[in-house]
């Protein structure tokens, strides 16, 4: 009896983790796809934080933004429908295994204010992002360990059709939003937004302080002006 109950609990837990990860990956991939340039700028922020910006070709951040959106979205769809369970869960646990320590470093050193996990749609602090990733890593490890407990929503005869549709959909969405405007614009100054209201400093927030410095130098004489 205990064995059957444990088997049932593991199955429920695994599928709950599977659906949670599917929603997160689909949403994350989608919001990156609707604003590929915004994702590119965030990747450039990461490169600058690591000191790699000067050594990386200019086209790579944009290419990486497209690939990231497509991979996350497709993995989410694969998890949702239970397609290629072993391969999908392996990729998911590897991604979370890399992102979790990375976000811990971001939380400790704070080189950038927002990880960009969900684009401009949802803004999280670095510590909130790390906490989220710890939970998702546990979920990813669970679906990887008990991947055979994932209940497929489509048969193997039709899983290729779902996979192809997911790939074509997210590819088309990314290219359309690159050439046109985002179909869902999460940016702070989107069309129809009140720019004056958007520029207001929130109550209690510290205003940005700028310092202008001029350096006058002639031969060995040098003077700083503030």
Predicted regions and their residues:
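Perimembrane loop-to-helix junctions flanking transmembrane segments
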Residues: 42-58
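Interfacial/capping segments of alpha-helical transmembrane domains
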Residues: 32-45
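Internal/C-terminal transmembrane anchor helices
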Residues: 153-183
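Membrane-interface segments at or immediately adjacent to transmembrane helices
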Residues: 172-226
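Short, Lys/Arg-rich, polar N-terminal cytosolic tail immediately upstream
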Residues: 1-12
């Amino acid at each position: 009896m205990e064995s059957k109950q444990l088997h049932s609990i593991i199955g429920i837990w695994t599928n709950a983790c599977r659906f949670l990860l599917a929603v997160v990956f689909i949403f994350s991939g989608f919001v990156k796809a609707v604003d590929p340039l915004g994702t590119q700028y965030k990747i450039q922020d990461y490169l600058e934080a690591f000191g790699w910006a000067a050594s990386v070709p200019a086209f790579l951040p944009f290419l990486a933004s497209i690939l990231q959106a497509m991979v996350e979205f497709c993995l989410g769809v694969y998890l949702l429908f239970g397609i290629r369970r072993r391969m999908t869960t392996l990729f998911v646990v590897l991604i979370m295994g890399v992102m979790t320590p990375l976000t811990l470093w971001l939380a400790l050193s704070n080189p950038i204010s927002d990880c960009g996990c969900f684009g401009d749609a949802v803004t999280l602090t670095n510590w909130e992002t790390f906490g989220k990733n710890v939970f998702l890593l546990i979920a990813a490890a669970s679906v990887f360990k008990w991947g055979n407990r994932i209940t497929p929503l489509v048969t193997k005869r039709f899983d290729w059709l779902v996979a192809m549709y997911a790939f074509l959909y997210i590819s088309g969405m990314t290219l359309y939003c690159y050439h046109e405007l985002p179909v869902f614009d999460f940016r702070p100054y989107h069309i129809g937004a009140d720019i004056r209201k958007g520029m207001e400093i929130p109550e209690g927030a510290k205003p940005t302080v700028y310092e202008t410095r001029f350096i006058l130098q002639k031969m060995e004489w040098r003077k700083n002006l503030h």
